[in-house]
Amino acid sequence: KPVTRTLQEMGYTNITVVKEQEQPDGHFPTCPYPNPEIKEAMALGMEYARKCNADLLLATDPDCDRVGIAVKNKAGEYELLTGNQTGMLLLDYICSQRIKHGKMPADPVMIKTIVTMDMGEQIAAHYGLRTVNVLTGFKFIGEQIGKLEQLGKADSYVSGSYVRDKDGVDGAYMICEMFSYYATQGISLLDRLDELYKTYGYCLNTLHSYEFDGSAGFARMQSIMQAFRGGIKEFGGKKVVRLLDYVQGLDGLPKSDVLKFLLENNCSLVVRPSGTEPKLKIYISVSAENKEMAEKVEDEIAKTAEKWIC
C-alpha cells in the first residue's frame, strides 16, 4: 500500500496490483520464498504483467525494504534485473540528473557495501563521486550518512538523508522516475544498461550460498574461513592481487569475519558467513568484454572457490 500510494501521488494512474499478494500473509502461499530478487517470487507478478501488457513490474518483500523489477526486452518477454543492475542504473541516472540540473554537491559521495557491484565505483568516479565502502548491512550506510551530516554534507546522500535503512518505497519511487524519464527518450532500462556496459565493460555479479546447519555446521564454516586465509594464489586462473581481511578492522570499519580477494582484470571474490542464516556466502564480481566471456570467467572462479568449501 505505501508503494501504491507513492506512485499515485507521483501521478501514475494505470496501476495493477497482484490481488493474491495484496494482503499480508505470513505463510507466503503464493511463492516459495518472498524475496523479490529471485525469479520464483516474481512468477505471479509476471503472469499479471503479461495479461495487462505492463511496462514495468515492481515487487517488494513483505516488510518493504527491498524492491525487485522486471522489464520487457525486445522480444516482449519480461526480464528480471538483479539488484546490482538496478543499482548501476539508479546511480548513473541520479548522478546525470543532478549534474544536468545543477544539484550535485561540491563533494559528492557514494556509499556502498564491500559486496556490491565493483562497477559502481567506475560510474561514481566518472561523475566525480568519492566512494565509501562499508560492511554488509544498511546500518553501516546509515552511520555514514550521520557522519556526513556532522561534516555538513547531508546532500552527499543521493536519494536523501531521511531514510537510514533499506526502504523499498524510496527505491520504487526512484525506479519509476528513472523508467519514465528514459521512456520519454525512447529507450528502455535494458537499452540504458547496454550503454553502461559499452562504456564501462560488461559486469557480472553473482551470489553463491552454502548451508551449514547446527553447531557442527558453524564449526565447519569457521574452518572454511581459515582455509581461505591460507594464502590462496588464484581463483579460476585469475591471480589474487590483494587480500583484504576485515577481521582486522580495515579502513576504520568494525572487525568482521569477511574476506575480499581482489583479482586481476578487475574481478573480485568476497566470502563471509551470513549474519542471520546458517550459510556461507560467496560474492563474485567479474568484468569482461561481453556476457558470454563474463559467465565463463565467473564459472571458473566459482569452481575454484567451491574446492575450498566442499
Task: Walk through the language-model features, giving the residues of each.
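Active-site pocket-lining segments that scaffold enzyme catalytic pockets across diverse folds
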Residues: 1-11
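Short Gly/Thr/Asp-enriched flexible loops that form oxyanion-binding sites at enzyme active sites
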Residues: 3-4, 65-84, 120
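Active/binding-pocket-proximal capping segment
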Residues: 9, 20-25, 139-141, 277-279
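Short, charged, surface-exposed secondary-structure boundary motifs
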Residues: 25-29, 91, 142-146
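Gly/Ser/Thr-rich active-site loops/lids in small-molecule metabolic enzymes
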Residues: 13-17, 77-95, 168-174
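Phosphate-binding and adjacent anionic-ligand microenvironments
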Residues: 50, 54-56, 60, 77-79, ...
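Short, acidic/turn-prone active-site loops that include or flank metal/cofactor-
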Residues: 19-23, 83-87, 135-139
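N-terminal small/polar loop signature for handling phosphorylated ligands or for N-terminal nucleophile
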Residues: 11-66
